[in-house]
């Protein structure tokens, strides 16, 4: 959290071009004077003149504390997996977002009659992230799926992937999960639809 906060502060100051940039923070020292430096660095001002000094900063955040901080320090949020049918997952985190704060959801869209085939790469990605992108007991994607009420499925997927059973892990991804975060299928299926029943 502190690293991200300092990073955003450095970016905002760089974009503003009001100073030769110096940062004495813990994570992003400018100029760098640590191991391997020549000691000759000096504060610089960004040479480019942005069209506006307040360039919007969007952050990808997933954990509750990260999302809360993103709503405080950034201009927008890039959620990884966001289901419009489960607004409660991030309701507390985004409740006090700044005015004008944007949520930019990345949604896969494909018009096709073969829904299962279209969902397969999404299931594969979910299976890999839920099961293998993190340590057992500390995987932010597994934790997110648990908050989305897929906890037992997420833990099972993680067990399978960590045992090297990737195909089974992908097959274990509940159908509702990839279906809620994408718009895949024939035209009638892409229209707004009621939320699925809870698992």
List each language-model region with its residue ranges.
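Active-site-adjacent structural elements that line small-molecule/cofactor binding pockets in enzymes
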Residues: 1-199
């Amino acid at each position: 959290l502190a690293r991200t906060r300092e990073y955003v502060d450095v970016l905002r100051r760089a974009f503003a071009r009001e100073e030769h940039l110096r940062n004495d923070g813990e994570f992003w020292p400018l100029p760098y004077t640590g191991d391997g430096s020549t000691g000759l660095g000096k504060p610089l001002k960004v040479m480019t003149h942005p069209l506006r000094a307040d360039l919007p900063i969007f952050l990808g955040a997933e954990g509750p504390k990260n999302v809360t901080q993103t709503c405080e320090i950034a201009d927008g949020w890039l959620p990884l997996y966001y289901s419009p049918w489960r607004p409660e997952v991030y309701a507390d985190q985004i409740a006090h977002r700044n005015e004008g704060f944007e949520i930019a959801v990345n949604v896969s869209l494909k018009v096709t009659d073969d829904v299962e085939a279209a969902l397969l790469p999404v299931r594969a990605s979910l299976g890999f992230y839920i099961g293998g992108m993190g340590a057992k007991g500390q995987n932010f994607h597994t934790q997110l799926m648990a908050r989305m009420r897929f906890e037992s499925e997420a833990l099972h997927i993680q067990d399978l992937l960590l045992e090297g059973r990737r195909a089974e892990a992908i097959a274990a991804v509940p159908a509702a999960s990839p279906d809620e975060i994408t718009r895949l299928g024939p035209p009638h299926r892409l229209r707004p639809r009621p939320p699925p029943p809870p698992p």
